[in-house]
């Protein structure tokens, strides 16, 4: 459906139901979702969403993912307070990935770092190049 409509003019619309019906969810019913800070373009994290998480996110404006480890919906910030407020949700041209533009409160990463991409690779090494902005023990009480 997405490829079929890629030559449509700007302003062309389909229903949310049709778009969700045609997303390329994987065998587990999930689609990759990249969270990006809406005003700076900073890439914060990658997580997974199922249809229910997408629908809840769009309905509430608070970003909800699907936790593979817990096997349930994960409302970002429900235990840490580090909430993501939805600014815009975009679907890529193949319908197999989402870009979730957010306003991130505090850190996005469970390590207490602003984002999850703190390992920087070059031809010889991989180096941690970002410090936590908050102690994870303070975020999660562990």
UniProtKB/Swiss-Prot annotation:
Q: Could you say which EC number(s) this protein's record lists?
A: 3.5.4.19
Q: Where in the cell is it found?
A: Cytoplasm
EC class: hydrolase
Q: Give, as in the UniProt entry, the pathway in which the protein acts.
A: Amino-acid biosynthesis; L-histidine biosynthesis; L-histidine from 5-phospho-alpha-D-ribose 1-diphosphate: step 3/9
What name appears for this protein in its UniProt entry? Phosphoribosyl-AMP cyclohydrolase
Q: Give the matching InterPro entries.
A: PRA-CH, PRib_AMP_CycHydrolase_dom, PRib_AMP_CycHydrolase_sf
* Biological processes, Gene Ontology terms: L-histidine biosynthetic process
User: Per the record, GO CC terms?
Assistant: cytoplasm
Q: What does this protein do?
A: Catalyzes the hydrolysis of the adenine ring of phosphoribosyl-AMP.
Catalytic reaction list: 1-(5-phospho-beta-D-ribosyl)-5'-AMP + H2O = 1-(5-phospho-beta-D-ribosyl)-5-[(5-phospho-beta-D-ribosylamino)methylideneamino]imidazole-4-carboxamide
Q: Which gene name does the record give? A: hisI
Give me the comment on cofactor binding.
Binds 1 Mg(2+) ion per subunit.
What Pfam families does the database record attribute to this sequence?
PRA-CH (PF01502)
């Amino acid at each position: 459906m997405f490829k079929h409509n890629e030559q449509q003019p700007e302003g062309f619309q389909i229903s949310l139901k049709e778009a969700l019906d045609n997303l390329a969810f994987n065998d587990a019913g999930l689609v990759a979702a990249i969270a990006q800070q809406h005003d700076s373009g900073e890439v914060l994290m990658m997580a997974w969403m199922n249809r229910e998480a997408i629908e809840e996110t769009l309905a509430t404006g608070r970003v909800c993912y699907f936790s593979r480890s817990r096997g349930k919906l994960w409302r970002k910030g429900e235990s840490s307070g580090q909430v993501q407020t939805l600014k815009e949700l975009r679907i890529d041209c193949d319908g197999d990935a989402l870009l979730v533009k957010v306003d991130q409160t505090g850190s996005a990463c469970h390590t207490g770092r602003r984002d999850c991409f703190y390992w920087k690779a070059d031809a010889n090494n991989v180096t941690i190049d970002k410090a936590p902005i908050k102690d994870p023990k303070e975020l999660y009480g562990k």
